[in-house]
């Protein structure tokens, strides 16, 4: 029999294991009770358990393993190795676990608390409170984390707009109420801030329930989000479910299912709209790859698990709306090395209605939210859904910005003055559109000192139409930067002109003469890196 603690020489657990590697079934001793077993091998997060007598626990059934001086370890069955042994994945640290430890099958899958008792709470993958609040009542209702998607006849199509108040989203990549949207971006481009702003929008606009699944993210970010939600007053209608990056892969892999079980309860039993936010779905795939390796499966492309497509589909298909209640999913997706052809990214993208692409170049220029207006898209951008006027403005905005990008190499080499009059005019309007599509967020008020702005779709369309028409050609670009509506920009422009007039008057009175004011076409306060030659 192979050494139960054998490794591959690098500290990683050997993947080549079979039923003969489980350990001697006689180690079970006298544990002949129904559902009772003994640990016969421990390899990191993988625990092999032998049962003597009675039926084996079913796949996905939960097992509890008492540990001296610590909370019991919860594990989940993932393979039947023989007629008397199973392989389980521990959802917590296995330190202190030893061969021969007693194991008890629970008779069903992991069950987590649901209902009003979990609102405003931070939970682990098993539903245990992770905040400084009181323990949950023993009689709180619980639901299994494993469940099928609603029947097709029960599902409702997502064709109603989910207005976010974020201009670039509502105009160019509108979200569906009851649909799925994903934000794709590399590290440090603002995915988490964007998720928090959407939670704020849900609470303010729809008075619904928000369920946030933190999958494999930093503990510091999770703590900051908890404090921010408390400070902003949105925590009372939000449930936070965390599986941090320091936790075993099994916990990170099952966190989305725990969040889904809670969201499904409010959808089915309370008929309430739910905003389900997941940050980060790539970490779910990553945890699945770790689990696959621990269970001895051969990897597929780029080291991902061979079941990548089916695992992503099983998760995404459960996110569904029914008559009377909608589950709207917003998913942050990390793009490794900014490679949008990565198998994990393409597998997730196949299931979403709206794709929001966050651009590192936009972030470098200070254009926040750093959403690429050309690469982002939505199936809802259709005249039958949003109307002809909306689609016409969105198409023209994309065309103008895309043409400006095509001219940027020429501008960098020769300068903007070498362009024709029409192209110079288009470049000016494209730059003003880019700045108008920025806006301050409510969740960043404490850092920027600028009040957040939520803009109606009609105001966004009217503002973009005015810029495309040339109504703002003589405005400073800085007047359109980080504002809400065009009226806000108009007031900002008027204030800047008044300030220039006062400076000119003061300069004339002192004899210095005019000529020290900023260029009214470009403004003096534009974001770093936003000059024409960039």
UniProtKB/Swiss-Prot annotation:
Catalytic function, reaction form: ATP + H2O + 4 H(+)(in) = ADP + phosphate + 5 H(+)(out)
InterPro entries named among the record's database cross-references: AAA+_ATPase (IPR003593), ATP-synt_VA_C (IPR055190), ATP_synth_F1_bsu (IPR005722), ATPase_a/bsu_AS (IPR020003), ATPase_alpha/beta_chains (IPR050053), ATPase_F1/V1/A1_a/bsu_N (IPR004100), ATPase_F1/V1/A1_a/bsu_N_sf (IPR036121), ATPase_F1/V1/A1_a/bsu_nucl-bd (IPR000194)
Positions of ATP binding: 185-192
CDD domains referenced in this protein's UniProt entry, alphabetically: ATP-synt_F1_beta_C (cd18110), F1-ATPase_beta_CD (cd01133)
EC number: 7.1.2.2
Any GO CC annotation of this UniProt entry: proton-transporting ATP synthase complex
Ranges where the record places region Disordered: 494-534
SUBUNIT field: F-type ATPases have 2 components, CF(1) - the catalytic core - and CF(0) - the membrane proton channel. CF(1) has five subunits: alpha(3), beta(3), gamma(1), delta(1), epsilon(1). CF(0) has three main subunits: a(1), b(2) and c(9-12). The alpha and beta chains form an alternating ring which encloses part of the gamma chain. CF(1) is attached to CF(0) by a central stalk formed by the gamma and epsilon chains, while a peripheral stalk is formed by the delta and b chains.
Entry-linked HAMAP family: ATP_synth_beta_bact
Family matches, as PANTHER family: ATP SYNTHASE, ATP SYNTHASE SUBUNIT BETA, MITOCHONDRIAL
Family designation: Belongs to the ATPase alpha/beta chains family.
Protein name per its UniProtKB record: ATP synthase subunit beta 2
Species whose genome carries this gene: Burkholderia mallei (strain ATCC 23344)
Gene that specifies this protein: atpD2
């Amino acid at each position: 029999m192979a050494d139960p603690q054998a490794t591959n020489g690098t500290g990683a657990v050997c993947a080549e294991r079979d039923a003969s590697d489980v350990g001697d079934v006689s180690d079970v001793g006298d544990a002949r009770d129904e559902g009772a077993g003994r640990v016969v091998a421990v390899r990191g997060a993988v625990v092999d358990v032998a049962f003597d007598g009675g039926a084996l626990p079913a796949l996905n059934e939960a097992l509890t393993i008492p540990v001296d001086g610590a909370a019991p370890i919860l594990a989940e069955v993932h393979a039947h190795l023989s007629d008397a042994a199973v392989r389980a994945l521990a959802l917590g640290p296995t330190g202190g676990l030893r061969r021969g430890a007693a194991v008890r099958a629970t008779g069903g899958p992991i069950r987590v608390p649901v209902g009003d008792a979990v609102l405003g709470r931070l939970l682990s993958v098993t539903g245990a409170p992770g905040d400084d609040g009181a323990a949950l009542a023993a009689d709180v209702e619980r639901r299994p984390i494993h469940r099928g998607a609603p029947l097709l006849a029960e599902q409702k199509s997502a064709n109603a707009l989910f207005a976010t108040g974020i201009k670039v989203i509502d105009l160019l990549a509108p979200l569906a109420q009851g649909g799925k949207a994903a934000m794709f971006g590399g590290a440090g481009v603002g995915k988490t801030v964007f998720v928090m702003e959407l939670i704020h929008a849900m609470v303010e606009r729809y008075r619904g329930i928000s369920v946030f699944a933190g999958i494999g993210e930093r503990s510091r970010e999770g703590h900051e989000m908890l404090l921010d939600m408390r400070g902003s007053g949105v925590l009372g209608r939000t449930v936070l479910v965390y599986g941090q990056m320091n936790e075993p892969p099994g916990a990170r892999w099952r966190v989305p299912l725990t969040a889904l079980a809670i969201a499904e309860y409010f959808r089915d039993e309370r008929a309430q709209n739910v905003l389900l936010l997941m940050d980060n779905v790539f970490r779910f795939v990553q945890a699945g790859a770790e689990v696959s390796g621990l269970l001895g499966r051969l990897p597929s492309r780029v080291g991902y698990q061979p079941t990548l497509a089916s695992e992503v589909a099983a998760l995404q298909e459960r996110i569904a709306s029914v008559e009377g209640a909608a589950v709207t999913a917003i998913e942050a997706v990390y793009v490794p090395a900014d490679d949008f052809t990565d198998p994990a990214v393409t597998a997730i993208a196949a299931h979403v209605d709206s794709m929001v692409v966050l651009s590192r170049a936009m972030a470098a220029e200070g254009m926040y939210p750093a959403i690429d207006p050309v690469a982002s898209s939505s199936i809802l951008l259709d005249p039958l859904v949003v109307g002809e006027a909306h689609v016409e403005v969105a198409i023209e905005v994309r065309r103008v910005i895309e043409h400006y990008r095509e001219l940027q190499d020429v501008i960098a080499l020769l300068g903007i003055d070498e362009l024709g009059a029409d192209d110079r005019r288009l470049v000016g309007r494209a730059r003003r559109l880019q700045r108008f599509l920025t806006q301050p967020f409510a969740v960043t008020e404490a850092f920027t000192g600028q009040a957040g702005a939520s803009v109606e779709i009609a105001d966004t369309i009217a503002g973009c139409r005015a810029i495309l028409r040339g109504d703002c050609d003589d405005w400073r670009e800085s007047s359109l930067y980080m504002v809400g509506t065009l009226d806000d920009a108009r007031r900002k422009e008027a204030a800047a002109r008044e300030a220039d007039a006062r400076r000119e008057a003061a300069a004339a009175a002192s004899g210095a003469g005019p000529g020290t004011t900023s260029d009214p076409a470009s403004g003096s306060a534009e974001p770093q890196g936003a000059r024409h030659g960039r």
